[in-house]
Amino acid sequence: MDRFRVESRTIAAIGYDLAAGVLEVEFHDGSVYQYDVPHAIYEGLLDAKSHSKYLRDHIRDVYPFRKIR
């Protein structure tokens, strides 16, 4: 999945697979997580003033995830 860089203290890059409904988040520490989220949530993350805060408040502990690296 292609990811693109974002301006964030904790998040390095974000990608989304529309067909699978999977958000991929790469953190500055090198870890990568995938979250099963609807496209609207992905768009909300992109539009958020703080990507980290949006992830914490609207995605983490709400949607299924897996650590892939």
Write out the residue ranges for each language-model feature.
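Acidic/histidine-enriched, beta-strand-rich ligand/metal-binding domains
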Residues: 1-69
